[in-house]
Every structure is written in structure tokens, then in C-alpha cells.
């Protein structure tokens, strides 16, 4: 049986009275005291003990009430009520310190619970928005497959080129699923080896799968090298993915028949390269230009509800850039267009 504080105090006081009375009775039997003195001492002990019990009750009642309130608070928290409780216990010191420790623990648990809920929601939205990055390679595979099936593509070099594109897009899908797994599981520690990159050849391989779409949509796409750029070392796989996602974004949020420019320049120190992809699309309002790289930010918030999709492509591009010695910046004007610039730092493999 668990006794309350009040019961324990009463038992203690009663036990003290009984013990004292027993000692006085023994003293009387042994004739250490006469009857009158023994009675006086016994009554004095009882009265003093009762007064002690009364005084203790006066001081102990507020403490008991605080303990009861604290108990209610812990039960509410245990039942999942994580709402902040500003109830303050200033005294006694032990109760105050216990309350402070509990509040700190409760705050940390609440933050962790909120973080877990947020991460679960983000992962759910991430899976729901997976179609965003699947559309372009799947559309390319379907388009070239139908062209081969229907006999639209007949020349030998066109057939070979179509097969090359199909293989490339299938590989891109495989890479996409790898990256999706990386995002869902947070950090997998995946790294890429540095490779020697000839930028013009890299851009040709990236732009080739878009050739039919650009012709079909009557678009103009121009690549401009502001200066001659020698081969340099960078992480080829993530760089291809970054540029592909940015190009997908430019095509998606600009009108058919519009122009897309890719401008490449090298800084004077020849240690960084800027690749700017500009469209004549709908633009992004300034206050949302930073948020477009967030994992769960939906692009229709800042652009057009008719476009659908999500900001997953930009999120992946930005994450890959940060992890692989690059940076993406954005500038945009509403109804004028958007420019996404990838700044690459050349890798010094000798160090």
C-alpha cells in the first residue's frame, strides 16, 4: 500500500507520542519519576506533538497541493497532451527544480515529436510528388518508342540515335530512383568520383534528348560560351542531373514557342564556371525565390496552379549542388522570365 505524505506525517507523530509515552511509563515503573511528573510529561508530550502536527499540516498542505498539480501535469503529458504548461512552482526549492527539469524534458520531447511528424509529412508528400521527376524521362521513352513502333523514325542513324536516347533516359530513371532513395533515407553517404569534363560535349549529351521536344514546341534554344573553357575536373553525374533538372524547370514554366538561353562563362581567376539557364517564363515573386529549393515547397504556389508538379526537381538539384562543390542562384522577374545559375568550382585533384 502506498501512503500519502500526510498519512506518513500523522503516523510519524503518533509513533513519536506512543514511543515517548512508553518511555515515560517505563520510567514511572522504575520510579524514576513520581506519578504527577509522569502525567505532566505525558500530557506535555501529547500537546506538543499535536501542535507539531498542526504546524506541519499548515506548511505541508501547500506542498501536497503542488505535488498533486504536478502529478496532473505529468499525466496529461503522458496522455499525449504536449501543449505548453506555464504553471510555475517557485517553492520549495526541490519542487521548483523538479518542475524546471520536467519542463525542459517536455520541451525537448515536444520538439522531437514535432520534428518526427514534420519528417513523416515531408516523406509522404515526397512520395506523392515522385511523378514530377518521372515525367520527362518517361515522356521521352514513350515518344521515341512510339516513333520506332509506328515507323516515323526510319533512317539508320536516327534509329541508332533513338536507341541511345532510350538507354540514356532509362539510365536517368535508374539514377532518379537512386536519388529518391537517398532523399527518403536522408543521408546515405553516396559520393561521386571526379571526372575530366569537356563542357561543350557534356551539354551536347544533356541537350540531345530534348531535341525532338524543342522542335515540336517550336522553341529556340541557344548555348553561348562567353569565353573558351578548357577541360576541368568536376563530379559529372550530379552535374548532369543538376543541369537536366534546371532545364526541365525552364521548359515546364515557359510557353511553347519561347526562347531558352544557356550562357557559360569562366571567371578571371579561372577557378569557377557559371552556367546560366534563362527562360521567358512566368517568373517567381521575390519572397518565394529562396523557398523554391525546399523539399516540400510546391511550385504552383509561386508560379501557376495549372502547371502542377512540385519543387522536388529543384530541391534535388540544390542538394546535389551543395554536396558536390557547386551552388545554384536564382533571379526572376514576373512575366519576364527566370535565370537559374549554377556556379561550379573546379576541382584540384592534385590536392
Swiss-Prot record:
Residues spanning the signal sequence: none
Transmembrane segment boundaries: 9-29, 40-60
Record's subcellular location: Cell membrane
Chief site of localization: membrane
GO molecular function terms listed in the Swiss-Prot or TrEMBL record: ATP binding; phosphorelay response regulator activity; phosphorelay sensor kinase activity; protein kinase activator activity
Keyword Nucleotide-binding carried by entry: yes
EC number: 2.7.13.3
Induction field: Transcription is affected by Agr and SarA. Also, transcriptionally repressed by NaCL, pH below 6, glucose and the antibiotic clindamycin.
Top-level taxon of origin: Bacteria
InterPro entries xref list: 2-comp_sensor_kinase, HAMP_dom, HATPase_C_sf, His_kinase_dom, HisK_dim/P_dom, HisK_dim/P_sf, Sig_transdc_His_kin-like_C
GO cellular component, one term: plasma membrane
Histidine kinase domain mapped to chain residues: 129-348
Annotated catalysed reactions: ATP + protein L-histidine = ADP + protein N-phospho-L-histidine
GO biological process: osmosensory signaling via phosphorelay pathway
Post-translational modification: Autophosphorylated.
Membrane topology: Multi-pass membrane protein
Residue ranges constituting the HAMP domain according to the UniProt record: 61-114
Residue numbers of Phosphohistidine PTMs: 132
Keywords on record: ATP-binding, Cell membrane, Kinase, Membrane, Nucleotide-binding, Phosphoprotein, Transferase, Transmembrane, Transmembrane helix, Two-component regulatory system, Virulence
Function: Member of the two-component regulatory system SaeR/SaeS involved in the regulation of staphylococcal virulence factors in a strain-dependent fashion. Probably functions as a membrane-associated protein kinase that upon sensing the appropriate signal, autophosphorylates and in turn activates the cytosolic response regulator SaeR. SaeR/SaeS activates the expression of exoproteins involved in adhesion and invasion of host cells, including hemolysins (hla, hlb), coa, Dnase, spa and cell wall-associated proteins (emp, eap, fnbA).
PANTHER family on file: PHOSPHATE REGULON SENSOR PROTEIN PHOR
Name of the protein described by the UniProt record: Histidine protein kinase SaeS
Amino acid at each position: 500500500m502506498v501512503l500519502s505524505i500526510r498519512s506518513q506525517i500523522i503516523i510519524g507523530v503518533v509513533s513519536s507520542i506512543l514511543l515517548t509515552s512508553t518511555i515515560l511509563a517505563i520510567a514511572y515503573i522504575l520510579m524514576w519519576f513520581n506519578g504527577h511528573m509522569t502525567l505532566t510529561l505525558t500530557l506535555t508530550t501529547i500537546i506538543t506533538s499535536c501542535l507539531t502536527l498542526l504546524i506541519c499540516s499548515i506548511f505541508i498542505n501547500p506542498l501536497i497541493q503542488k505535488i498533486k498539480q504536478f502529478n496532473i501535469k505529468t499525466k496529461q503529458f503522458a496522455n499525449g497532451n504536449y501543449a505548453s504548461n506555464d504553471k510555475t512552482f517557485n517553492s520549495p526549492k526541490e519542487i521548483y527544480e523538479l518542475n524546471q527539469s520536467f519542463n525542459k524534458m517536455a520541451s525537448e520531447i515536444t520538439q522531437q515529436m514535432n520534428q518526427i511528424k514534420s519528417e513523416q509529412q515531408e516523406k509522404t508528400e515526397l512520395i506523392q510528388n515522385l511523378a514530377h521527376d518521372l515525367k520527362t524521362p518517361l515522356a521521352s521513352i514513350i515518344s521515341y518508342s512510339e516513333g520506332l513502333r509506328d515507323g516515323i523514325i526510319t533512317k539508320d542513324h536516327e534509329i541508332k540515335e533513338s536507341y541511345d536516347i532510350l538507354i540514356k533516359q532509362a539510365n536517368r530513371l535508374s539514377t532518379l530512383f537512386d536519388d529518391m532513395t537517398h532523399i527518403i533515407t536522408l543521408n546515405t553517404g553516396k559520393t561521386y568520383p571526379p571526372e575530366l569534363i569537356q563542357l561543350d560535349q557534356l551539354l551536347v549529351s544533356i541537350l540531345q534528348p530534348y531535341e525532338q521536344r524543342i522542335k515540336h514546341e517550336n522553341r529556340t534554344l541557344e548555348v553561348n560560351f562567353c569565353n573558351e573553357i578548357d577541360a576541368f575536373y568536376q563530379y559529372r553525374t550530379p552535374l548532369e542531373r543538376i543541369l537536366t533538372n534546371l532545364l526541365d524547370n525552364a521548359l515546364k514554366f515557359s510557353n511553347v514557342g519561347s526562347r531558352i538561353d544557356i550562357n557559360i562563362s569562366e571567371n578571371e581567376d579561372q577557378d569557377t564556371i557559371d552556367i546560366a539557364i534563362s527562360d521567358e517564363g512566368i517568373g517567381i515573386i521575390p519572397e518565394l525565390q529562396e523557398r523554391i529549393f525546399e523539399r516540400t515547397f510546391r511550385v504552383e504556389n509561386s508560379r501557376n496552379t495549372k502547371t502542377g508538379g512540385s519543387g522536388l526537381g529543384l530541391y534535388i538539384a540544390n542538394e546535389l549542388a551543395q554536396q558536390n562543390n557547386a551552388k545554384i542562384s536564382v533571379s526572376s522577374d514576373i512575366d519576364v522570365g527566370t535565370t537559374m545559375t549554377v556556379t561550379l568550382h573546379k576541382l584540384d585533384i592534385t590536392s
